[in-house]
Amino acid sequence: MRHKSGGRKLQRTSAHRTAMFRNMSASLIKHEQITTTVAKAKELRPYVEKLVTLAKRGGLANRRLAMSRLMDEAQLAKLFDVLAARYKDRNGGYTRIIKAGIRASDAAPIAIIEFVDRDMGAKGQDSGPVTTDEELEDA
């Protein structure tokens, strides 16, 4: 039987899809807005909304379940502390998808997926390692 085996494969193996959704959900939680293709955004939406629902319920078991899906401790802390508090009175619908035209290189439809009532300052936070002046002088 094929029950509950739907969803897009996105031309990837199951391990690649899992890793991609982990990375995309961590980026979405960190920046609260990301740009991707429409198909990936539509598949990412239920993945992230289930994580927010786990965070709203709280508790150690739900934190461990979310960690097994997210695999990023910093974003797990933000999910359970910031986002759970922000959406405590909202029953679902934590994200929105805005279609943003087509990509110039391959004409793929592009979309912006973002949290509703997002923090405008979160977008564009530094993602890479921080180098100090001392490290630059030593190099």
Swiss-Prot record:
InterPro entries, A to Z: Ribosomal_bL17, Ribosomal_bL17_CS, Ribosomal_bL17_sf
Gene3D superfamilies reported in the protein's UniProt record: Ribosomal protein L17 (3.90.1030.10)
Gene Ontology CC, one term: cytosolic large ribosomal subunit
Source species, domain of life: Bacteria
Stored Pfam families: Ribosomal_L17
Alphabetical keyword list: Ribonucleoprotein, Ribosomal protein
Listed GO biological process terms: translation
MF term (GO), any: structural constituent of ribosome
Family, similarity comment: Belongs to the bacterial ribosomal protein bL17 family.
Subunit structure: Part of the 50S ribosomal subunit. Contacts protein L32.
UniProt-listed NCBIfam families: L17
PANTHER family listed in its UniProt record: LARGE RIBOSOMAL SUBUNIT PROTEIN BL17M (PTHR14413:SF16), RIBOSOMAL PROTEIN L17 (PTHR14413)
Protein name: Large ribosomal subunit protein bL17
Source lineage: Bacteria, Pseudomonadati, Pseudomonadota, Alphaproteobacteria, Sphingomonadales
